[in-house]
Design a protein with these regions (language model features):
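Conserved small/polar residues in nucleotide/adenosyl-binding loops
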Residues: 192-194
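Conserved ATP-driven motor cores of ASCE-family P-loop NTPases powering translocation/secretion/packaging/pilus
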Residues: 91, 95-188
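P-loop NTPase motor domains
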Residues: 1-108, 112, 124, 165, ...
Length: 194
């Protein structure tokens, strides 16, 4: 008796063809031109126009690569900018959350960045994204912009005094949270290091 149905095998072959020679080959069928893996940037902007299943596959490839570097190799820093891209997939959120919990044991760090806190407060992901704000030992919090004050304070676990420090937009000013300590930072660009 057959282990796989003919229909399933046909779907697999069509998927492989698409990834190797078809429409998705631009994402999956290429050789790297990166001679060193000391500093890598995966630009995900082009993925936004891909089909959801292709986008999810590519995001998981990136997550798997990052996870290996962070948790197996260690002594690595990974940054996920434009985090909203990952929030449409509950499995990706869980993957990121679990990675955040374990990276410090391997002398690694994970940076999460997003311009819009409201992306984390959507009904379908709210409970899953809440821990993303309580796990990191270091947080740099900037002015909330137009987001509701109470939502901002609740999501980031801020009291009134902490919120008031960053209530108004000020270039380079942020609240730095490190454990139970709080610092108001003013960040300046030093031309010496450029």
């Amino acid at each position: 008796h057959l282990l796989y149905t003919e229909k399933l095998l046909q779907e697999v072959l069509l998927g492989l063809h698409s990834m190797c020679k078809g429409a998705d080959a631009q994402f999956f069928n290429g050789h790297t031109n990166i001679p060193s893996s000391r500093f890598l940037v995966f630009g995900v902007k082009g993925m936004l126009s891909a089909a959801k299943n292709v986008r999810n596959a590519m995001l998981f490839n990136v997550l798997s690569f990052m996870s290996d570097k962070l948790l197996t190799v260690g002594n690595t820093v990974a940054a996920l900018d434009e985090l909203y891209i990952w929030l449409s997939n509950p499995t990706a959120i869980e993957y990121i959350r679990n990675c955040l919990k374990r990276v410090r044991k391997k002398e690694s760090a994970m940076l999460l960045a997003s311009q819009n806190l409201e992306d984390f407060d959507q009904e379908q992901v709210r409970e899953m994204t809440k821990p993303l704000f309580s796990i990191p030992p270091h947080q740099f919090l900037f002015n909330a912009g137009s987001i509701d004050k109470r939502s901002y304070m609740e999501m980031l676990q801020l009291d009134e005094a902490e919120y008031n420090l960053i209530k108004f937009p000020q270039r380079g000013v942020c609240l730095y949270k490190c454990g139970n300590e709080r610092y108001l930072l003013e960040v300046h660009l030093s031309l010496i290091h450029i």
